[in-house]
Amino acid sequence: MTQLIMGIDPGTLVSGYAIILVEQRYKIRAHSYGAIRLSSKDSLTQRYKQLFQTISGVLNDITPDAVVLETQYVHKNPQSTIKLGMARGVLVLAAALRDIPVFEYAPNVAKRAVVGRGNASKQQVQLMVSKMLNIPDVLNANCEDIADAFALAICHAHTSSYDFLGVR
């Protein structure tokens, strides 16, 4: 039995997504990944629309068994929190319209699942994801969001493995 898990690191300018294939007990492979890059010149409404359309296209091509997002956290700037929350809402809606369950994990929980420490740096997450899944290009400077998305998907694979395997 296999399972596809999609992690998404949401953003109003860049959203990373990563899909892993989970086979048997903890056998995890990278399936596909990418970054949705939006223009700061576009209105927020236009960016949300483009984010929705792009992630919908990915979900139509590859229907994962679960979508995983970071939990909402509060920025120092309340407007940033609201804007990010709206981007998350667009992503949740895209999954919900396809009856794909959505799960959330705090960033420190996802980091702990991959690096072993909840306060790991983005570079440490990139390095561990690269090594775990044998994807050297995730080490590129512009792939932090993709590495975070992989970390979320891996976190869910580890957290849900007992339910996935029918073990409690």
UniProtKB/Swiss-Prot annotation:
It catalyses: Endonucleolytic cleavage at a junction such as a reciprocal single-stranded crossover between two homologous DNA duplexes (Holliday junction). One of its GO terms (cellular component) is Holliday junction resolvase complex. This is Crossover junction endodeoxyribonuclease RuvC. Keywords: Cytoplasm, DNA damage, DNA recombination, DNA repair, DNA-binding, Endonuclease, Hydrolase, Magnesium, Metal-binding, Nuclease. One of its GO terms (molecular function) is crossover junction DNA endonuclease activity. Its cofactor is Mg(2+). GO terms for biological process: DNA recombination; DNA repair. Its EC number is 3.1.21.10. PANTHER family: CROSSOVER JUNCTION ENDODEOXYRIBONUCLEASE RUVC (PTHR30194:SF3). Homodimer which binds Holliday junction (HJ) DNA. The HJ becomes 2-fold symmetrical on binding to RuvC with unstacked arms; it has a different conformation from HJ DNA in complex with RuvA. In the full resolvosome a probable DNA-RuvA(4)-RuvB(12)-RuvC(2) complex forms which resolves the HJ. Binds 2 Mg(2+) ion per subunit. It comes from Chlamydia felis (strain Fe/C-56). It is found in: Cytoplasm. Coiled coil: none annotated. The gene is ruvC. Mg(2+) 1 binds at D9, D145. Belongs to the RuvC family. HAMAP family: RuvC. The RuvA-RuvB-RuvC complex processes Holliday junction (HJ) DNA during genetic recombination and DNA repair. Endonuclease that resolves HJ intermediates. Cleaves cruciform DNA by making single-stranded nicks across the HJ at symmetrical positions within the homologous arms, yielding a 5'-phosphate and a 3'-hydroxyl group; requires a central core of homology in the junction. The consensus cleavage sequence is 5'-(A/T)TT(C/G)-3'. Cleavage occurs on the 3'-side of the TT dinucleotide at the point of strand exchange. Mg(2+) 2 binds at E70. The active site is at D9, E70, D145.
